[in-house]
Amino acid sequence: MDDVSIPIDEIYLPAKRRAEIDPARVEALAESILEEGLQVPISVRKGKGRYVLVAGLQRLEAMKALGEETVIAIVVGSPQH
């Protein structure tokens, strides 16, 4: 799987996941990203006209906090039903 750059505003975050945001962790990650760059891409899957976050909530929020417009992501397959 290749890493791709995705516009942050095209990534959907389900409401229940928003409750999992840890402001202290987001701040620490933002500082780390400023110093070293994003070391581990987030994971998303394709949804209807957008991407859905699979993994990397705190990293995504840190990128938003830094004012970034895009984020490096790995696009994974949809879950099997």
Predicted feature descriptions by range:
Residues 1-77:
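Short, charged/polar connector segments at secondary-structure boundaries
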Residues 79-81:
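A short acidic, often aromatic-flanked loop/helix-cap motif at beta-alpha or helix-coil junctions
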